[in-house]
Amino acid sequence: GYQDKSIKEITREMFDLADGMTMSAKKDGIVNMGGFIATRRKEWYEGAKGFCVQYEGYLTYGGMNGRDMNALAIGLDENTEFDNLETRIKQVEYLAQKLDEYEIPYQRPAGGHAIFVDASKVLTHVPKEEFPAQTLTVELYLEAGIRGCEIGYILADRDPITHENRFNGLDLLRLAIPRRVYTLS
């Protein structure tokens, strides 16, 4: 059992089991841009490093400035602290409760950093060819100034051979919860 282990210990053990990982650090790394690839396999490293230099920057910084690398290190540390994780989860739960009150459908269970609203069920009058999640994303911003992100048909891109839109899967509006805000104050 893990009930007596710290989040840092659980995280360390989890990553010890992986051959490799990627992370977009914009959310839980508390930086404005960046991320990383980590691997213990030499051949994966050798295969990836050429792309780093070509597209991102030298291997030691990958296109990130020193300030963002320092912020990422702090963010990774802070996000293995129980109090921070608990606060974040409670923020997401709070939004989920509000959506429940208004019977707005979303993916359950609620996540650790975001809520995914089922746009096809909210905008039933918008056909899939008019991209319900993108429509909801735009309208929510115009009406309330709330910035979300479409995770669905547009993100799925078009079929590379037929160039037709791909409409299989879900069409969701992601509402990522900002960090370090006074949600309930």
Q: Which residues does each predicted region cover?
A:
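Phosphate/diphosphate-binding loops
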Residues: M23-G29, P132-A144
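Short glycine/threonine-rich loop-to-helix capping motif typified by GTGT followed
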Residues: F116-F131, P160-R166
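Short, conserved charged micro-motifs
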Residues: Y45-E46, T124-P132, R180-S185
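Conserved glycine-rich beta-strand-loop-beta hairpin in the small C-terminal domain of fold type I
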Residues: I89-E93, Q107-A119
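Conserved PLP-enzyme active-site core in the AAT-like
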Residues: G1-E101, P127
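PLP-dependent enzyme catalytic core of the Aspartate aminotransferase-like
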Residues: N79, E143, I154-S185
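Short acidic (Asp/Glu) and glycine-rich catalytic loops that position anionic groups and cofactors
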Residues: K49-C52, M69-E78, H113-V122, N168-R174
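Short, glycine-/Ser/Thr-/acidic-enriched flexible segments
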Residues: K26-G29, R41-W44, D77-N79, G112-H113, ...
